[in-house]
Design a protein with these regions (language model features):
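N-terminal export signals
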Residues: 2-21
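N-terminal Rossmann-like FAD-binding beta1-loop-alpha1 element of flavoenzymes
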Residues: 30-54
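Glycine-rich FAD pyrophosphate-binding loop
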Residues: 48-66
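Dinucleotide-binding Rossmann-like beta1-alpha1 core, especially the glycine-rich loop
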Residues: 71-149, 267-269, 277, 300, ...
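Flavin (FAD/FMN) cofactor-binding and adjacent substrate-gating region
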Residues: 93, 104-106, 116-186, 191-192, ...
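Central helical "cap/lid" subdomain
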Residues: 219-260
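Active-site lid/adjacent beta-loop-alpha segment flanking the redox-cofactor pocket in flavoenzymes
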Residues: 256-356
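C-terminal catalytic lobe of FAD-dependent flavoproteins
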Residues: 321-406
Length: 406
């Protein structure tokens, strides 16, 4: 969707109201800190709109949360309340535009999800009924329909599964790289390794961004820095309470087609990319003990040794094999610890810092789902001086109440 069309859409619908400021600005120099999927989308949309864009990252594109994500594009039952669900639905739809515009590595086909606990299974059915009321084409399916949708997955005939046909998956590393490459083709500059260290102000206004690779003139700074714990407070002067947690992603070598859709089974998530690689994500998280706490204190992305990484991946494969026996033949290619940015109320943080209005924050879980719409709306706010009312619930200055949604 181009910027002109998006402006017309926002003006014409109640979904995302917006108020135009009198001092709309154009041709701004914008530094985007963070070359993950959110930063890449914002940079792409800014460059497309004519901004002078520089993207910086202390390591490189998609080397942090965006590498360690299961990469599930969805607007499922966890997206509460209804306004957040609608926001997610809009972004899922916008992924189709990006898919075709940039030939992104996305696989559509939906998801199947179920639980072993009878009470949780009953609650899931209630949640899916609510999703249907909200316009999501989801439904519960029995074992017979499940076998048609996913014939290579063993399914307990005593339960039903939630089928969400609009869901998809993306290769987050390749998608990030393609978004950044497209931004560069439109004049953006990508600098790495280049760590954000400070900002320079003159009369209270941003003049430059200081990095480990030098100073960059800037009118605006975007913080798309994921789970980094202190950057928002240090650079934007605002505390963002997070309960950041690790999640392990294991990726197999390419193998013949086994899975048609995303499968969210008890204890394991799995999907298969177009290149044949199967992506595994664990559900239960790391054990809560002192040894793991010490090991994870520095937020590592890699296991202490390749042997430990393989041991962990083999445990994940063993769980996956109970549902998809054909995965027993898989060989593990990569194991990575991803650190997910999780604001404690489960919602994204999007908007300018009240303490430093020249600094725009875009930090969230579900970054893969929300990347397209966040890129579009952040560009409207940064370049067109538009205040998008639909983002009001996600501003950095809100009151954060802890709600566990995932």
């Amino acid at each position: 969707m181009d910027r002109r069309t998006l402006l017309k859409l926002l003006a014409a619908t109640a979904l995302a109201g917006c108020n135009t400021q009198d001092d709309a600005t154009k041709d701004l120099k914008v530094v985007v800190a963070g070359a993950g999927i959110i930063g890449a989308s914002i940079a792409y949309h800014l460059a497309k709109a004519g901004a002078v864009v520089t993207i910086i990252d202390k390591q490189g594109p998609a080397t942090h949360a965006s590498r360690g994500t299961f990469a599930w594009i969805n607007a499922t039952w966890a997206k509460q309340p209804r306004s957040y669900h609608a926001f997610s639905q809009s972004s899922v739809a916008n992924w189709h535009d990006l898919h075709h515009a940039l030939n992104l590595p996305i696989r559509w086909g939906g998801s199947l999800e179920w639980f072993e606990n009878p009470e949780r299974e009953t609650k899931l059915a209630t949640q899916i009924a609510e999703q249907v009321e909200w316009g999501e084409p989801a439904r519960m399916v029995d074992a017979a329909e499940f076998a048609i949708l996913e014939p290579n997955v063993a399914f307990n005939t005593g339960v039903t599964a939630a089928y969400s046909p609009n869901d998809g998956t993306v290769d987050p590393v390749l998608a990030t790289q393609k978004l950044l490459a497209a931004a560069e083709q439109m004049g953006a500059t990508l600098r790495y390794p280049s760590e954000l260290t400070n900002v320079e102000l003159a009369n209270g206004r941003l003049t430059s961004v200081e990095t480990s690779s030098g100073s960059i003139p800037a009118d605006r700074l975007v913080l798309a820095t994921g789970a980094a714990p202190d950057i928002a407070a240090r650079i934007a002067g605002i505390e963002l309470p997070q309960r950041t947690r690790p999640g392990v992603i294991a990726i197999t070598e390419p193998m013949p087609r086994l899975l048609n859709r995303i499968v969210s089974a008890p204890g394991i998530h799995m999907h298969q990319r177009d290149d044949g690689r199967i992506v595994l994500g664990e559900q239960d998280g790391v054990p809560q003990n002192e040894a793991h706490a010490l090991r994870l204190a520095g937020r590592p992305n890699n296991f202490p040794s390749p042997e430990l990484a393989q041991e962990h991946a083999q445990r994940m494969l063993a769980v996956a094999k109970t549902f998809a026996p054909g995965i027993a033949a898989a060989s593990i290619d990569d194991v990575y610890i991803g650190w997910r940015p999780l604001p404690i109320d489960g919602h994204p943080v999007i908007g300018a810092s009240s303490n430093r209005p020249d600094t725009y924050i875009a930090i969230m879980h579900s970054g893969v789902t929300l990347a397209p719409i966040v890129g579009q709306l952040a560009t409207l706010e940064l370049l067109d001086g538009i205040v998008v009312d639909n983002l009001d619930d996600y501003r950095p200055g809100r009151v954060f109440n802890e709600i566990k949604r995932y």
